[in-house]
């Protein structure tokens, strides 16, 4: 399957995320805690927890922090009781936006999210207004120059759903959300190391933005991502330089 290049846009957004590393540990700890609460403390039996722990290790989170977060989720240690909630809406030029939160106060969270939408030119919508535009999946990006045929064979053998060749030569391997870690491990065992990858909500159709619209949209996304209760922000917008 062929696709246009997402490489530059992914690098662009990853750079912004890396600039906010001060909040990354807090968000990862919350995700580990909730994952353990929902599916138990054994990462081998809990795909969501395994993803969260793998991500924490990739960010060099100390082992004790990870173990304590799991124990808070399973009730072995006292902790805050977080609730999952999702808010949907529209950004600049009607671009779809979905905001996933973990909070101990939904009243506060919905007010904060609504304020960010309103302040930066978006509109908060009703439940389900844009969720159908996104697919829950995992992806791994391999830099230009990788052996595409060998990667495709290894990826499909490992359980990947699709392999996408982009215009710039980069290759994306698409997986189911709960097969991501297994596919990643299988490819690494065969010498294929991805540049980046994650489980995400991916827009089925993208909204290309440039100029002033791109600037305004980025401000909205930044405002949402900066909220303490927000875990992830997904959008159909592709931000031009």
UniProtKB/Swiss-Prot annotation:
Short name of one Pfam family: TACO1_YebC_N
InterPro entries associated with the record: Integrase-like_N (IPR017856), TACO1_YebC-like_2nd/3rd_dom (IPR048300), TACO1_YebC_N (IPR049083), Transcrip_reg_TACO1-like (IPR002876), Transcrip_reg_TACO1-like_dom3 (IPR026564), YebC-like (IPR029072)
Record's keyword terms, sorted: Cytoplasm, DNA-binding, Transcription, Transcription regulation
GO annotation, cellular component aspect: cytosol
GO molecular function: DNA binding
Gene Ontology process terms (BP): regulation of DNA-templated transcription
Annotated compartments: Cytoplasm
Entry similarity comment: Belongs to the TACO1 family.
Protein name: Probable transcriptional regulatory protein CV_3123
Organism per entry: Chromobacterium violaceum (strain ATCC 12472 / DSM 30191 / JCM 1249 / CCUG 213 / NBRC 12614 / NCIMB 9131 / NCTC 9757 / MK)
């Amino acid at each position: 399957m062929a696709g246009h290049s997402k490489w530059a846009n992914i690098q662009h957004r990853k750079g912004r995320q890396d600039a906010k590393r001060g909040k990354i540990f807090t968000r990862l700890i919350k995700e580990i805690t909730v994952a353990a609460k929902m599916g138990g403390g054994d990462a081998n039996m809990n795909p969501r927890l395994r993803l969260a722990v793998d991500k924490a290790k990739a960010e060099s989170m100390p082992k004790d922090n990870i173990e304590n977060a799991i124990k808070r989720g399973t009730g072995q240690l006292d902790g805050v009781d977080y609730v999952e909630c999702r808010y949907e809406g529209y950004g600049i030029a009607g671009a779809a936006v979905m905001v996933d939160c973990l909070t101990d106060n939904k009243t506060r969270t919905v007010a904060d999210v609504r304020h960010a939408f309103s302040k930066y030119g978006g509109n908060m919508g009703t439940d389900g207004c844009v969720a159908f535009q996104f697919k829950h999946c995992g992806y791994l990006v391999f830099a230009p120059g990788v052996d595409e045929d060998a990667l495709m064979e290894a990826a499909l053998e490992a359980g990947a759903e699709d392999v996408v060749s982009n215009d710039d030569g980069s290759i994306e391997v698409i997986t189911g959300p709960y097969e991501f870690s297994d596919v990643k491990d299988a490819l690494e065992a065969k010498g294929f190391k991805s540049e980046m990858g994650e489980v995400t909500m991916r827009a089925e159709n993208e909204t290309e933005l440039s100029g002033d619209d791109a600037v305004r949209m980025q401000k909205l996304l930044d405002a949402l991502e900066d909220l303490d209760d927000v875990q992830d922000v997904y959008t159909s917008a592709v931000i031009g330089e």
